[in-house]
Amino acid sequence: MVKRREFLKAAGVSAVAMGRPHVLNVAQSSAPASVPGDAKYPKLAIKTRYSPQRLAFAASAGYEGVVVDLDDFFDPDKLSDNQIDQILATVRDTGVRIISIECMLNHLAPDSVERRQTRARFIRCLELAHRLGCKFVGTFSGGKKGASVDEQVKELAEVLNEQYLPVCEKLDLGIGPENYPCDVNFATVPATWEKVMALVPSHRFGLEFDPSHLVRQYIDPIQTAWDFRDRILAVHAKDTEIIQPVLAKVGIHGKGWWRYRIPGQGLIDWPKFITVLLQAGFHGGVAVEHEDEFWDVPQGDDGPEMAQERKDGFILAARFLRQYLPGRLS
Protein backbone atom coordinates (compact mmCIF):
# COMPACT_ATOMS: atom_id res chain seq x y z
CA MET A 1 0.00 0.00 0.00
CA VAL A 2 1.28 3.46 -0.89
CA LYS A 3 1.56 5.58 2.24
CA ARG A 4 0.18 9.09 2.35
CA ARG A 5 3.54 10.83 2.35
CA GLU A 6 4.84 8.68 -0.49
CA PHE A 7 1.70 9.59 -2.42
CA LEU A 8 2.22 13.30 -1.75
CA LYS A 9 5.73 13.08 -3.16
CA ALA A 10 4.64 11.25 -6.29
CA ALA A 11 1.19 12.55 -7.21
CA GLY A 12 0.53 15.87 -8.87
CA VAL A 13 -1.59 18.56 -7.28
CA SER A 14 -3.76 18.50 -10.38
CA ALA A 15 -4.80 14.95 -9.50
CA VAL A 16 -5.47 15.65 -5.84
CA ALA A 17 -6.33 19.30 -5.56
CA MET A 18 -7.45 20.33 -9.02
CA GLY A 19 -9.49 17.31 -10.10
CA ARG A 20 -7.48 16.70 -13.27
CA PRO A 21 -5.72 13.54 -14.48
CA HIS A 22 -2.33 15.14 -15.12
CA VAL A 23 0.50 14.12 -12.77
CA LEU A 24 3.33 16.48 -11.94
CA ASN A 25 6.55 15.41 -10.26
CA VAL A 26 7.04 17.77 -7.34
CA ALA A 27 10.80 17.63 -7.85
CA GLN A 28 10.33 19.76 -10.95
CA SER A 29 9.38 22.80 -8.86
CA SER A 30 11.65 24.79 -6.58
CA ALA A 31 10.90 24.40 -2.88
CA PRO A 32 10.34 27.64 -0.99
CA ALA A 33 12.60 28.83 1.80
CA SER A 34 11.98 27.15 5.13
CA VAL A 35 10.97 28.56 8.47
CA PRO A 36 12.95 27.45 11.56
CA GLY A 37 12.82 23.82 12.55
CA ASP A 38 14.45 20.63 11.36
CA ALA A 39 11.24 18.81 10.49
CA LYS A 40 10.20 19.30 6.89
CA TYR A 41 6.51 19.90 7.32
CA PRO A 42 4.34 23.01 7.78
CA LYS A 43 4.29 24.36 11.33
CA LEU A 44 0.84 25.16 12.73
CA ALA A 45 0.92 28.52 14.50
CA ILE A 46 -1.24 31.37 15.73
CA LYS A 47 -0.85 35.01 14.76
CA THR A 48 -0.91 37.04 17.96
CA ARG A 49 0.63 39.68 20.14
CA TYR A 50 3.52 38.54 22.32
CA SER A 51 3.09 37.54 25.94
CA PRO A 52 4.25 34.50 27.92
CA GLN A 53 0.60 33.64 28.55
CA ARG A 54 -0.16 33.58 24.83
CA LEU A 55 2.76 31.28 24.08
CA ALA A 56 1.64 28.98 26.89
CA PHE A 57 -1.88 28.92 25.47
CA ALA A 58 -0.57 28.14 21.98
CA ALA A 59 1.32 25.16 23.40
CA SER A 60 -1.72 23.91 25.32
CA ALA A 61 -3.89 24.16 22.19
CA GLY A 62 -1.50 22.04 20.13
CA TYR A 63 0.24 24.77 18.16
CA GLU A 64 3.93 24.59 17.35
CA GLY A 65 4.62 28.28 16.92
CA VAL A 66 3.46 31.87 16.97
CA VAL A 67 3.66 34.70 14.46
CA VAL A 68 4.08 37.89 16.46
CA ASP A 69 2.75 41.34 15.62
CA LEU A 70 4.65 44.48 16.54
CA ASP A 71 3.15 46.46 19.42
CA ASP A 72 4.22 48.90 22.14
CA PHE A 73 6.31 46.20 23.84
CA PHE A 74 7.36 43.93 21.00
CA ASP A 75 9.25 46.53 19.00
CA PRO A 76 12.81 46.43 17.64
CA ASP A 77 13.34 50.00 18.81
CA LYS A 78 12.23 49.29 22.38
CA LEU A 79 13.24 45.76 23.32
CA SER A 80 16.37 45.56 25.46
CA ASP A 81 18.87 42.72 25.26
CA ASN A 82 17.56 41.44 28.59
CA GLN A 83 13.97 41.45 27.31
CA ILE A 84 14.99 39.56 24.19
CA ASP A 85 16.72 36.98 26.39
CA GLN A 86 13.53 36.67 28.44
CA ILE A 87 11.48 36.12 25.28
CA LEU A 88 13.87 33.38 24.16
CA ALA A 89 13.63 31.78 27.60
CA THR A 90 9.83 31.74 27.29
CA VAL A 91 10.17 30.11 23.88
CA ARG A 92 12.32 27.37 25.42
CA ASP A 93 10.02 26.91 28.42
CA THR A 94 6.82 26.62 26.37
CA GLY A 95 8.27 24.72 23.44
CA VAL A 96 6.49 27.14 21.10
CA ARG A 97 8.84 28.95 18.76
CA ILE A 98 8.43 32.38 17.24
CA ILE A 99 8.16 31.40 13.60
CA SER A 100 8.09 34.92 12.20
CA ILE A 101 7.29 38.52 13.03
CA GLU A 102 4.94 40.93 11.29
CA CYS A 103 6.17 44.40 10.30
CA MET A 104 3.35 45.95 8.29
CA LEU A 105 5.04 49.12 7.01
CA ASN A 106 4.66 51.37 3.98
CA HIS A 107 7.94 50.95 2.12
CA LEU A 108 6.77 53.41 -0.55
CA ALA A 109 5.74 56.26 1.75
CA PRO A 110 5.41 59.46 -0.33
CA ASP A 111 7.38 61.61 2.12
CA SER A 112 11.11 61.05 1.66
CA VAL A 113 11.92 61.37 5.37
CA GLU A 114 9.17 58.94 6.36
CA ARG A 115 10.26 56.57 3.61
CA ARG A 116 13.87 56.59 4.79
CA GLN A 117 12.83 56.04 8.41
CA THR A 118 10.44 53.24 7.46
CA ARG A 119 13.08 51.38 5.50
CA ALA A 120 15.60 51.69 8.32
CA ARG A 121 13.00 50.44 10.77
CA PHE A 122 12.25 47.43 8.59
CA ILE A 123 15.91 46.48 8.58
CA ARG A 124 15.84 46.64 12.39
CA CYS A 125 12.83 44.29 12.24
CA LEU A 126 14.91 41.89 10.17
CA GLU A 127 17.69 42.03 12.73
CA LEU A 128 15.24 41.36 15.58
CA ALA A 129 13.76 38.40 13.71
CA HIS A 130 17.24 36.95 13.26
CA ARG A 131 17.98 37.27 16.97
CA LEU A 132 14.76 35.43 17.76
CA GLY A 133 15.61 32.55 15.43
CA CYS A 134 13.06 33.40 12.76
CA LYS A 135 13.49 32.71 9.07
CA PHE A 136 10.74 34.98 7.75
CA VAL A 137 9.38 38.50 8.25
CA GLY A 138 5.94 39.45 6.95
CA THR A 139 5.10 42.93 5.73
CA PHE A 140 3.09 44.96 3.22
CA SER A 141 4.29 45.86 -0.26
CA GLY A 142 3.64 49.54 0.38
CA GLY A 143 1.57 52.03 -1.52
CA LYS A 144 1.95 55.49 -3.03
CA LYS A 145 -1.25 57.37 -3.79
CA GLY A 146 -1.35 58.68 -7.35
CA ALA A 147 1.43 56.39 -8.59
CA SER A 148 0.71 53.75 -11.22
CA VAL A 149 1.09 50.05 -10.49
CA ASP A 150 4.17 49.88 -12.70
CA GLU A 151 5.77 52.82 -10.89
CA GLN A 152 5.16 51.16 -7.54
CA VAL A 153 6.47 47.84 -8.83
CA LYS A 154 9.69 49.50 -9.96
CA GLU A 155 10.24 51.32 -6.66
CA LEU A 156 9.46 48.25 -4.55
CA ALA A 157 11.84 46.13 -6.62
CA GLU A 158 14.59 48.70 -6.11
CA VAL A 159 14.27 48.78 -2.33
CA LEU A 160 14.07 44.99 -2.18
CA ASN A 161 17.09 44.37 -4.37
CA GLU A 162 19.26 47.21 -3.08
CA GLN A 163 18.41 47.43 0.62
CA TYR A 164 16.41 44.53 2.05
CA LEU A 165 17.55 41.40 0.25
CA PRO A 166 21.28 41.91 0.92
CA VAL A 167 20.38 41.99 4.63
CA CYS A 168 18.16 38.93 4.21
CA GLU A 169 21.01 37.08 2.54
CA LYS A 170 23.35 37.95 5.40
CA LEU A 171 20.83 36.96 8.10
CA ASP A 172 19.34 33.95 6.27
CA LEU A 173 15.83 35.41 6.15
CA GLY A 174 12.91 35.48 3.75
CA ILE A 175 10.46 38.36 3.44
CA GLY A 176 7.14 38.85 1.73
CA PRO A 177 3.93 40.86 1.73
CA GLU A 178 0.59 39.60 2.94
CA ASN A 179 -2.00 39.99 0.18
CA TYR A 180 -4.37 42.15 2.25
CA PRO A 181 -5.97 44.80 0.01
CA CYS A 182 -5.43 48.29 1.46
CA ASP A 183 -3.95 51.68 0.56
CA VAL A 184 -0.44 50.78 1.76
CA ASN A 185 -0.32 47.37 0.07
CA PHE A 186 -0.59 47.60 -3.71
CA ALA A 187 0.71 44.09 -4.55
CA THR A 188 -2.23 41.90 -3.57
CA VAL A 189 -3.24 40.07 -6.76
CA PRO A 190 -1.46 37.58 -9.05
CA ALA A 191 -0.94 39.97 -11.97
CA THR A 192 0.97 42.38 -9.73
CA TRP A 193 2.99 39.64 -8.04
CA GLU A 194 4.17 38.50 -11.46
CA LYS A 195 5.43 41.99 -12.24
CA VAL A 196 7.30 42.32 -8.94
CA MET A 197 8.83 38.85 -9.13
CA ALA A 198 10.02 39.45 -12.67
CA LEU A 199 12.22 42.22 -11.24
CA VAL A 200 13.05 40.41 -7.98
CA PRO A 201 14.26 36.91 -8.88
CA SER A 202 15.58 36.07 -5.41
CA HIS A 203 13.46 33.44 -3.68
CA ARG A 204 14.18 35.13 -0.39
CA PHE A 205 11.35 37.39 -1.49
CA GLY A 206 7.98 35.72 -1.77
CA LEU A 207 4.45 35.78 -0.43
CA GLU A 208 2.81 35.69 2.95
CA PHE A 209 -0.14 33.95 1.35
CA ASP A 210 -3.62 34.49 2.80
CA PRO A 211 -6.29 32.65 0.79
CA SER A 212 -9.16 34.46 2.53
CA HIS A 213 -8.38 37.76 0.78
CA LEU A 214 -8.59 36.08 -2.61
CA VAL A 215 -12.00 34.54 -1.92
CA ARG A 216 -13.65 37.92 -1.35
CA GLN A 217 -12.18 39.12 -4.65
CA TYR A 218 -13.49 36.03 -6.47
CA ILE A 219 -9.94 34.82 -7.21
CA ASP A 220 -9.43 31.06 -6.94
CA PRO A 221 -7.08 30.55 -3.95
CA ILE A 222 -6.22 26.95 -4.86
CA GLN A 223 -5.15 27.69 -8.43
CA THR A 224 -3.31 30.82 -7.30
CA ALA A 225 -1.44 28.92 -4.59
CA TRP A 226 -0.37 26.35 -7.17
CA ASP A 227 0.72 29.00 -9.65
CA PHE A 228 2.91 30.70 -7.01
CA ARG A 229 3.83 27.60 -5.02
CA ASP A 230 7.57 28.20 -5.20
CA ARG A 231 7.20 31.75 -3.83
CA ILE A 232 4.92 31.04 -0.86
CA LEU A 233 7.13 31.58 2.19
CA ALA A 234 4.44 31.88 4.87
CA VAL A 235 0.70 31.29 5.16
CA HIS A 236 -2.12 32.98 7.05
CA ALA A 237 -4.85 30.44 7.73
CA LYS A 238 -8.11 32.34 7.59
CA ASP A 239 -11.40 31.54 5.89
CA THR A 240 -14.03 33.71 4.20
CA GLU A 241 -17.79 33.35 4.22
CA ILE A 242 -19.87 34.91 1.45
CA ILE A 243 -23.37 35.82 2.63
CA GLN A 244 -25.28 35.40 -0.62
CA PRO A 245 -28.63 36.98 0.44
CA VAL A 246 -26.79 40.18 1.41
CA LEU A 247 -24.63 40.13 -1.72
CA ALA A 248 -27.78 39.80 -3.84
CA LYS A 249 -29.08 43.06 -2.37
CA VAL A 250 -25.99 45.26 -2.01
CA GLY A 251 -23.66 43.99 -4.77
CA ILE A 252 -19.89 43.60 -4.56
CA HIS A 253 -19.36 47.31 -3.80
CA GLY A 254 -21.73 47.15 -0.84
CA LYS A 255 -20.97 46.14 2.73
CA GLY A 256 -21.73 43.16 4.89
CA TRP A 257 -21.78 40.47 2.19
CA TRP A 258 -18.60 38.73 3.33
CA ARG A 259 -16.82 38.11 6.62
CA TYR A 260 -13.67 36.39 7.80
CA ARG A 261 -14.04 33.05 9.57
CA ILE A 262 -11.75 30.59 11.29
CA PRO A 263 -10.54 27.81 8.98
CA GLY A 264 -13.26 25.32 8.15
CA GLN A 265 -16.18 27.70 8.60
CA GLY A 266 -16.00 29.47 5.26
CA LEU A 267 -15.66 28.60 1.58
CA ILE A 268 -12.02 27.56 1.27
CA ASP A 269 -11.35 23.91 0.45
CA TRP A 270 -8.61 23.34 3.03
CA PRO A 271 -7.71 19.76 2.04
CA LYS A 272 -6.99 20.98 -1.49
CA PHE A 273 -5.14 24.10 -0.31
CA ILE A 274 -2.93 22.20 2.12
CA THR A 275 -2.29 19.53 -0.50
CA VAL A 276 -0.82 22.27 -2.69
CA LEU A 277 1.49 23.32 0.15
CA LEU A 278 2.59 19.75 0.81
CA GLN A 279 3.12 19.03 -2.89
CA ALA A 280 5.28 22.13 -3.15
CA GLY A 281 7.47 21.07 -0.24
CA PHE A 282 6.34 24.00 1.89
CA HIS A 283 7.55 23.73 5.48
CA GLY A 284 7.02 27.23 6.78
CA GLY A 285 4.42 28.57 9.17
CA VAL A 286 0.68 28.11 8.71
CA ALA A 287 -0.55 30.75 11.14
CA VAL A 288 -4.21 30.97 12.11
CA GLU A 289 -5.18 34.64 11.86
CA HIS A 290 -8.27 34.94 14.03
CA GLU A 291 -10.58 37.68 12.72
CA ASP A 292 -13.81 35.74 13.20
CA GLU A 293 -16.21 37.85 15.27
CA PHE A 294 -18.41 34.81 15.87
CA TRP A 295 -15.61 33.29 17.98
CA ASP A 296 -14.44 36.45 19.72
CA VAL A 297 -15.43 39.16 22.19
CA PRO A 298 -16.40 42.76 21.39
CA GLN A 299 -13.79 44.37 23.64
CA GLY A 300 -10.87 43.30 21.48
CA ASP A 301 -7.63 41.47 22.18
CA ASP A 302 -5.36 43.84 24.09
CA GLY A 303 -4.35 42.08 27.30
CA PRO A 304 -1.64 39.49 27.95
CA GLU A 305 -4.36 36.83 28.26
CA MET A 306 -6.88 36.02 25.55
CA ALA A 307 -10.56 35.87 26.34
CA GLN A 308 -11.86 32.31 26.45
CA GLU A 309 -14.16 32.97 23.50
CA ARG A 310 -11.13 33.88 21.39
CA LYS A 311 -9.22 30.86 22.64
CA ASP A 312 -12.15 28.69 21.58
CA GLY A 313 -11.75 29.95 18.01
CA PHE A 314 -8.06 29.04 17.96
CA ILE A 315 -8.76 25.63 19.52
CA LEU A 316 -11.40 24.82 16.90
CA ALA A 317 -9.09 26.00 14.11
CA ALA A 318 -6.29 23.74 15.36
CA ARG A 319 -8.60 20.74 15.56
CA PHE A 320 -9.76 21.36 12.01
CA LEU A 321 -6.40 22.04 10.36
CA ARG A 322 -4.54 19.25 12.14
CA GLN A 323 -6.55 16.74 10.07
CA TYR A 324 -4.63 17.80 6.98
CA LEU A 325 -1.18 18.74 8.32
CA PRO A 326 1.40 16.01 9.02
CA GLY A 327 2.66 17.84 12.12
CA ARG A 328 3.94 15.54 14.82
CA LEU A 329 2.28 12.44 13.38
CA SER A 330 4.53 9.40 13.41
What are these regions (language model features)?
Residues 69-88, 144-147:
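Glycine-rich, proline-tolerant flexible connector loops at the mouths of alpha/beta enzymes
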Residues 49-51, 71, 103-106, 142-144, ...:
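Active-site beta-loop-alpha junctions enriched in small/polar residues
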Residues 66, 101, 162-267, 271:
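Acidic/histidine-rich catalytic cores of soluble enzymes
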Residues 1-15:
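N-terminal secretory signal peptides and thylakoid transit peptides that target proteins
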Residues 11-20, 32-36, 48, 52-59, ...:
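Active-site acidic/histidine proton-transfer and metal-coordination neighborhood
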Residues 42-48, 66-68, 98-103, 137-139, ...:
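Hydrophobic faces of well-ordered beta-strands that scaffold small-molecule active sites
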Residues 58, 66, 91, 129, ...:
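Conserved, mostly hydrophobic/aromatic
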Residues 304-329:
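C-terminal helical cap(s) of enzyme catalytic domains, especially alpha/beta-barrels
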